Structures are given as structure tokens and as C-alpha cells.
Amino acid sequence: MTDSYNSSRLPKIVFFHGLNNNTGCFGPLMSHFRESGFETEMVILPCHGENRKEAKNSKDALRVFAQSMKRLEKTSYFAIAFSHGALYLQLWMEKNPGNKPLKQILLAPALFIRKQKLIEKAMKILPSFVLVKSLAPKAFRRYEILTAGEYNILVQGIVTYQKIMNQLKVPSLVMIDPKDELVHAQNLKAKLEEKNKGLEVQFIERPYLKKGIGCHHILFHPDYYEKQDWEEFLQKLHSFLKV
């Protein structure tokens, strides 16, 4: 399925991946939008590019992310942001009133996570070098395993966001699988809808999905949908991005 657009006036679509995702994770979705006439690019999250150690904590990571966003200062763009990438984008918009996306699609945004208080306590105890198993499917992983310090950048970002969260800064489509293993889908829906009048967080249900731990967190890839459901998912994205 492709929608017809006038490519001469289309904003760019900028993608933001999640924690421990590689640059190929959005491949099919980016190709789909390019075939529809959009120009696409991806923002690489802190510690996921050439320098894995460029940020030691959430504050460092947000500084690095803000530097990456400078290249979009004069760009008209839509954002499609997944998980940790969605968190970075919201934190950046809270502090940077500059060139925000025209619209944003948030896929399983890591703004509220399951067992959050327990995880926060664990992160305070664990040395930063302790290895933590990645829930990202192997095909989408940047690294085979994470450190507690790298995972804590996500956790502390979530804590910060929850302290300062307000209304979403731009028109938003938010989608989440209610069985998401990382994001607390029900809390996400309740909190965002409470803060944003008229917003409906959409549940994407896939009862047939049996690809192991972490599979319900993946919303961006056709291998995690039956064909008709993937087509419906794409249609929702296109309908929201109509210009």
C-alpha cells in the first residue's frame, strides 16, 4: 500500500530508534515512506553511534541528543519515534522551543515502564558496569548486551520526564501494544489522555504474535504483524501525516 503525495511540498520524515536498536531496524518502514514520496533520515541516539561512551548519564545523553537535533534547525519535518527515541524527543521539546516537528507519531514511547519503582531501586544499587540482558530482538540490536549504566540513562530520562511532563508539544499519534513488555501501556494511556484533551492513545492488539520476550514492544516492522494488520497500521500513519 502506498499513498499518493505531492513530493515537492512534503516535509521530511525523521525517525528516532529505541534503546539498543541498530540503524537498520526501521528499514522496511523507511523504504515504504520513501516509495510514497517522502525524504527520510534517522537520528542516532546517544551512545549508539561511533562512540558508545559519549554519555555517562541522562544529562550527558540529553546534551548529545540536543547536538544531533541542531541539524534539523531549518528543516520542516514529521517525527516517527520509537520507545527511548520518543522519550528523548519529548524531553528535548520540553526544553527547546525551537524547530519542533510538525507532527509526531510515537510508537511504544518509553514514558512509563512496567515495574518502574523496582527498576529505579535496582539502578541505584547496581554498579554501572554490570551487564544487563537486552530485550531488543537480535535482528534489531546495536549491541549484544547492555550495561546497567546504559539502561539507567533510559530510566533516569523517564523519571525526569514524569516530573516535568505537560501537554505534548505538537499534534501526536500515540500507539502501543497493550501487552508491551517494557512500556506500561495502561499507565501511558491514562496519563497522556489526562494531560492531553482529545488525545486517544491507540492500542495495537496482535493476539497471534509469538516471537519471544520483547516482541509486543516492536511496532515498526512488518514481521511482527499479519499482512492485513500491517496494511491497517500503515494506513493510520498515512492518515495522520496527511498534509
Named regions from a protein language model:
Residues 109-170, 177-183, 202-234:
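The alpha/beta-hydrolase serine catalytic core
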Residues 28, 91-95:
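Active-site signature of alpha/beta-hydrolase-fold catalytic machinery across serine-
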Residues 48-73:
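Catalytic nucleophile-loop/oxyanion-hole region of alpha/beta-hydrolase
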Residues 2-48:
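Short, surface-exposed "cap/lid" segments of acyl-processing enzymes
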Residues 184-194:
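Short alpha-helix in the alpha/beta-hydrolase fold that links the catalytic acid
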